[in-house]
Amino acid sequence: MIELNPGLLNVREQLADLYLRADKTQDATKQLEAILRERPTNERALFVLGGIKRDLDKLDEAAAHFETVLKLNSKFEPAYYELAGVRLFQNKPKETLATLRKATEQFKPNFINKFYAGLAHSSLHQYPKAIENLLEAEQLAQAAEQNRLTHFFYFQLGAAYERNRQYETANTILKKAIEISPEYHNAMNYLGYMWADINRNLDEAAKYIIKANELDPENAAYVDSLGWLHYRQGKHKEALTELRRAAELMKNEPDSTIHEHIGDALQQLGKADEAGTEWKISLGLLLEQEKKMTVPDAYLLEQLGNVLNKLGRSDKARASWQRSYEITPTEPLRQKLHSVKKEE
């Protein structure tokens, strides 16, 4: 009957709903596309089809559908948040924030707006703004939507605090994520590596890093954390073994940090030439990352300076550290800049 009477839009809408509930995405898509052929301005069909395209990772198509909805009806509030979410997945944080600002101009503040804004600011390495928005999101959720405050939410908040060098607060928040989800190994590794990286609380770092490795033993980032923990503990042979295993796990996508760590371990074992080779690999990878950098990244620039300094290129190291310091002035960076100036 529907094939003979394509104008029966209500029937098609009901069928699309039934197919979606039965996880028959292809059949639902056919019905929604048929509705849009008959009535291209059907907001609901466009919105639902945008969600399907998003779930299929067809992000450009999803964004186009949500944008069309908003052109047809600027008061269609959920479309703003769906579009903002797609822009986040596309790694377009500035466009995410622009979409959220339009929503803010018309609607009351809500959790998802502030949460997405926090994630977007984190992507732009604007960590104080990220923290501000995530805390507002938490406050809004506590008042009306407490189920939104998941382990993932607190992981994002904890990571923002860590990136802003507020380590004690990051520690508290990341532990909260783990309390909510006791096997959330991503947060365990993040917390453990944070302490190992700044060479503090190594016993606690060991607890979390070892547990993360038990839960996901083939995760290269976790193996790197284990190797770096051994390095901080002065176990340089054990460190090298784990770090080389991490590099093997990442052989198809080499990681600058892993190769820098391997170089550090080799240097401690008296293998200066091999260390230099690893640092050069790390440097090459970092320079590639720098070329792709769309917004200033203090962490990347600091690491670049570290590797350049290890390779004896103090002038370039200082320039990179200076750029990092201008983005996020920290005491460790100030000391590095001062030590290089003293050597000269």
Model-assigned labels for residue ranges:
Residues D17, G51, G85, L119, ...:
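Residue-level recognition of tetratricopeptide repeat
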Residues Q14, V48, E82, Y116, ...:
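Canonical tetratricopeptide repeat
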Residues L9-N10, E43-R44, E77-P78, F111-I112, ...:
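Helix-start (N-cap) detector for alpha-helical repeat units in TPR-like alpha-solenoids
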Residues R21-A22, D55-L56, F89-Q90, S123, ...:
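Register position in tetratricopeptide repeats
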Residues L4, E38, L72, E105-F107, ...:
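Structural marker of alpha-solenoid helical repeat scaffolds
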